[in-house]
């Protein structure tokens, strides 16, 4: 269990630093679209897709590596990667309605929670 915790810790830290570096490098290039964040999300989705595909075939891989790369690195780089993988799994299972609902709930829910947080913060600091 300690090895798994350390794997998440190391992978998460590394992914977070990678995301920060991408943001510092690419976000200033375009005012309306944070290109570094987009790159982190797309890269994380690609890595987790490759990771899950690879780990499903390489069943003898130590679980520490799986957790380091997927939960740790991709989780630190972006949580969008996990969401993307879950939608792809639903699509592969032929559960198209659930996949689309998952997309709507995750995206709209995330936007709504962000807006709610901004509203709560603004309301609490208005006076």
Swiss-Prot record:
Keyword terms: Cell inner membrane, Cell membrane, Ion channel, Ion transport, Membrane, Metal-binding, Sodium, Transmembrane, Transmembrane helix, Transport
Subcellular location: Cell inner membrane
Record text on activity regulation: Na(+) is not transported, but it plays an essential structural role and its presence is essential for fluoride channel function.
Catalytic reactions on record: fluoride(in) = fluoride(out)
InterPro entries: FluC
One term of GO molecular function: metal ion binding
Signal peptide: none
Membrane topology note: Multi-pass membrane protein
Transmembrane as UniProt keyword: yes
Binding site for Na(+): 75, 78
Membrane-crossing segments per the record: 4-24, 35-55, 71-91, 103-123
GO CC annotation terms, alphabetical: plasma membrane
A Gene Ontology biological process term: cellular detoxification of fluoride
The keyword Translocase is assigned to this record: no
Role: Fluoride-specific ion channel. Important for reducing fluoride concentration in the cell, thus reducing its toxicity.
Family affiliation: Belongs to the fluoride channel Fluc/FEX (TC 1.A.43) family.
Protein name per UniProt: Fluoride-specific ion channel FluC
């Amino acid at each position: 269990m300690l090895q798994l915790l350390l794997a998440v810790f190391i992978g998460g830290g590394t992914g977070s630093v990678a995301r920060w570096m991408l943001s510092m490098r690419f976000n200033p290039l375009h005012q309306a679209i944070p290109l570094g964040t987009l790159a982190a999300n797309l890269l994380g989705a690609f890595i987790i897709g490759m990771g899950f595909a690879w780990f499903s075939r390489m069943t003898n891989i130590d679980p520490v590596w799986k957790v380091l790369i997927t939960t740790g690195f991709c989780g630190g780089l972006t949580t969008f990667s996990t969401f993307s993988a879950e939608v792809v799994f639903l699509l592969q299972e032929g559960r198209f309605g659930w996949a689309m609902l998952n997309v709507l709930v995750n995206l709209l829910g995330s936007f709504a929670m962000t807006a709610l947080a901004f509203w709560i913060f603004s309301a609490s600091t208005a006076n």
